């Protein structure tokens, strides 16, 4: 109860509460009225083989916190509650509207670098609207099943880099669907489309 009250009074980052339930870590200290901060209470697992792939993508069932904390979104100030209702955990908006609330021409004043253009057309996702591959999460938050029936989306929310997958052996979002192809094929297709559209080359991963 004091945890919720402390959050309500503005003395605690909401994500400190969330990460404790949605991460893979060991407990360092028991929760007390003076110990709320995530890193004061927990020791998160590091990005190591068996838990994460070489490029940081989830491998073992590491839940969401570790992936999200390494994301550009988290570094820019995005919090769990920007996308999810903090009480029920459900998305605040349906489908791609979760992403286009910021990644759109109108954008969100808190995250100016996310807006300024539309990402909803086939010129961005290269797939027929409404079909597999056209949703933001298909490419930027690929899902993996754990224990057969437990799908989890990778919350690192990364830009697909099949060129890196070809070198590191990490999963490639494209060939997760195009299973008869290789990451090298994906990289060549993306490079061809990038040049045709005049899009800047991807920066460091």
Which residues make up each language-model segment?
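Primarily the internal scaffold of c-type cytochrome electron-transfer domains
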Residues: 1-205
